[in-house]
Design a protein with these regions (language model features):
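N-terminal secretory signal peptides and thylakoid transit peptides that target proteins
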Residues: 1-11
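N-terminal (or domain-start) structured segment
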Residues: 18-109, 147, 155, 171-201, ...
Length: 316
């Protein structure tokens, strides 16, 4: 009888009633094309996860729709069993406020598991560009409204909104060229198809190789790799932009599964190889656990609602 009493509490836990979690591969949706710091960090973390749990995390890159396809899948088709997860970023929290027919609640319709880090944004031009400083680029954008172009990874993304705020403040105008991911912007700039990139650090290798020139970084402090490049704070804008991101699942996940995933991913993030990638790409530490990440999403949703309304942004 004592044995039976010890087993019953385990059987009462739905997530672990049938078998130990995880007992099959986990699907992970990334709504951007492969490449860059995000891709490198996730792949290393998932290697560690597999070593620790015996199960792989299989990445699926599903680019498009301003980085919201992963969230759309979680809301419309995801089962709350822990076997389908997705990369989660600020555009997903912002998305419902951009349309008259929102398809999800940015807090209630997701299970927030762990915030990881944030993007390192900056503005770059080709090394042979006539614009040697941020001030040069802004002056030209003011003199030739709409003629200069800049790319981001999508309409109404954090970097798109930030760039438009900067241009508005400077009474300047550039034409926005949205791509499905930051790597496409690198290709376009290499091919002289655009004037500049204002996006995450997929441009890093080209800057180090002397192909691109970095005009500004959007981090709170200067980057050790580019100590001579000013931040937006240095330039007098009083702002920084990192756009933190993390891991979520469908709403309604069992707390035991969330706790298991959080602990496993936290261990993977603290792995020496993962930390080496973060240092290499100079990625900020934006870690939050499930409760703090959920609270962050709730507070950020209020901020995004106000910002979108103030700027009159819409995707309808």
């Amino acid at each position: 009888m004592r044995i039976a009493r010890r087993i019953l509490p385990l059987l009462a836990t739905p997530a672990f009633a049938q078998a130990r979690f995880p007992n099959r591969p986990i699907r992970f949706l990334i709504p951007w094309p492969p490449g860059g710091s995000l891709d490198a960090l996730h792949r290393r973390m998932f290697e560690v996860f597999q070593q620790d749990t015996g199960q792989p995390v299989l990445i699926e890159n599903i680019a498009g729709a301003r980085g919201t396809r992963g969230a759309t899948f979680l809301v419309q088709q995801g089962r709350p069993d822990g076997y389908t997860l997705a990369h989660h970023h600020l555009s997903i929290i912002r998305h419902p406020f951009l349309t008259r027919q929102p398809t999800w609640d940015p807090v209630a319709d997701f299970t927030y598991i762990m915030q990881i880090t944030g993007f390192v944004f900056g503005t770059v031009v080709r090394a042979d560009s006539p614009y040697r400083t941020w001030a040069d680029l802004i002056a030209a954008a003011r003199q030739k409204p709409g003629e200069l172009t800049y790319s981001t990874s999508g309409i109404a993304t954090s970097n798109h909104i930030a760039m438009e705020l900067l241009l508005e403040r400077e009474r300047a105008s550039m034409t926005h060229i949205p791509f499905r991911g930051s790597q496409e912007g690198v290709t376009a700039l290499l091919g002289r198809q655009i004037t500049a990139i204002s996006d995450s650090s997929s441009w890093r290798e080209q800057v180090l190789a002397g192909q691109f020139r970095l005009l500004s970084v959007w981090t709170p402090t200067r980057l050790p790799s580019f100590p001579d490049t000013p931040t937006l704070l240095d330039l007098g804008y009083g702002m920084s932009v990192t756009s933190p991101y993390g891991i979520t699942g469908p709403k309604g996940m069992e707390p035991e599964v969330v706790d298991f995933l959080h602990r496993a991913f936290r261990k993977a993030l603290l792995d020496e190889g993962s930390q080496r990638i973060m240092a290499q790409w100079e990625m900020p530490n934006e870690y939050l656990g499930p409760q703090a990440y959920t609270e962050f999403a709730r507070e950020r949703a209020a901020f995004e609602r106000e910002t979108v309304a103030r700027l009159g942004l819409t995707i309808d």
